[in-house]
Amino acid sequence: MEAKATAKYIRISPQKARLVVDLIRGKKVDDAREILNYSRKRSGQIVGKVLKSAFANAVQNPNIDEKILFVKEIFVDQGPSMKRWRARAQGRAASIKKRMSHITVILDEK
């Protein structure tokens, strides 16, 4: 039985979020939480919240044993980008893309 949680429009670059997501793919939920707690990356906190939400969704189902849950799938998709402008020399402007992410976590029993 699967449990799923998704966080959309998170203001962090997908490239930076994937660095943390790759660390916990396939791990047990307890091990994944420990890894995220000691991660110094900002995306570690965000991914931790999504993992906690997926775990809470799994606990709602009485047929699921929470002790044997593991991260079956976790991925980061690119969301929309906010376009901003930064002033540059001699009256020019440079565009800046502030990227967003959609983070999805799927837990399952081993």
UniProtKB/Swiss-Prot annotation:
PROSITE patterns: RIBOSOMAL_L22. It comes from the Bacteria. Pfam families: Ribosomal_L22. GO terms for biological process: translation. GO terms for molecular function: rRNA binding; structural constituent of ribosome. Gene3D superfamilies: Ribosomal protein L22/L17. InterPro entries: Ribosomal_uL22, Ribosomal_uL22_bac/chlpt-type, Ribosomal_uL22_bac/org-type, Ribosomal_uL22_CS, Ribosomal_uL22_sf. Belongs to the universal ribosomal protein uL22 family. This protein binds specifically to 23S rRNA; its binding is stimulated by other ribosomal proteins, e.g. L4, L17, and L20. It is important during the early stages of 50S assembly. It makes multiple contacts with different domains of the 23S rRNA in the assembled 50S subunit and ribosome. Part of the 50S ribosomal subunit. HAMAP family: Ribosomal_uL22_B. This is Large ribosomal subunit protein uL22. The gene is rplV.
